[in-house]
Amino acid sequence: MVLIRVLANLLILQLSYAQKSSELVIGGDECNINEHRLLAIVYTNSSQCAGTLINQEWVLTAAHCDGENMDIYLGVHNESVQYDDEEGRVAAEKFFCLSSRNYTKWDKDIMLIRLNIPVRNSTHIAPLSLPSSPPSVGSVCRVMGWGTITSPNETYPDVPHCANINLFDYEVCLAAYPEFGLPATSRTLCAGIQQGGKDTCGSDSGGSLICNGQFQGIVSWGDNPCAQPHKPALYTKVLDDTEWIQSIIAGNTAVTCPP
């Protein structure tokens, strides 16, 4: 069963659909307080996701994280401790690859959010640039999030967790999920640990996959339970949409994603 990795508000829901709702990192450790300055928490009436700050006014996340009354928080490390530079914002505008807001298991699970007020760079807040080159298969990549650290029973931590996973050829994910009829080629990245034990999971959706220091992927979907052997997760490929993202930020809001 595949999971869209999102945490439902009030009730923690495990969605048995082919998208990772926002999940916490399985098999990871508490992130160093200085390594997740880019990490946003994205709340709506019905879900919790993650996002990535790409400049002082814009956050990139997954399309399936969309919802009403969106709040975005940056600079948070411990939910029990408030830091002086924590920032809370609302979504002033949201942009999707398709005007219908459609997305699939393998394409266009991406949403660009303009914050109502820009944030300031600080000790705990800093953007991560868009990628300039594609990642290499075999790369060790970093994932981070506030999602559940256990699966299928869910345990949500007070601090974000980080883990290292491997980038695979897309064919590995193609073979792992024959029941979903994935296309022969895809604009997603396939990443995980073949023996299992490390994975993104519930409430990590929309977070970043960072390979060799570059923001290469957005947490999209994966298996349920999470972190199973031979069941890597799929991540929206950021590089394919950089021109669209940059055009939106520049004010060309009529631009469309590449086909």
Swiss-Prot record:
Domain annotation Peptidase S1: ranges: 25-250
Protein's recorded name: Thrombin-like enzyme gyroxin B1.7
Keywords, sorted A to Z: Blood coagulation cascade activating toxin, Disulfide bond, Glycoprotein, Hemostasis impairing toxin, Hydrolase, Protease, Secreted, Serine protease, Signal, Toxin
GO biological process assignments: proteolysis
Tissues and organs where the protein is expressed, per its UniProt entry: Expressed by the venom gland.
Top-level taxon: Eukaryota
Presence of the UniProt keyword RNA-binding in the record: no
Main location: secreted
Positions bearing carbohydrate: N102
SS bonds (residue pairs): C31-C162, C49-C65, C141-C211, C173-C190, C201-C226
Entry's localization field: Secreted
Propeptide: 19-259
Similarity comment: Belongs to the peptidase S1 family. Snake venom subfamily.
Any single GO CC term annotated in Swiss-Prot or TrEMBL for this entry: secretory granule
Signal peptide span: 1-18
Pfam families given in the database record: Trypsin
GO molecular function: serine-type endopeptidase activity; toxin activity
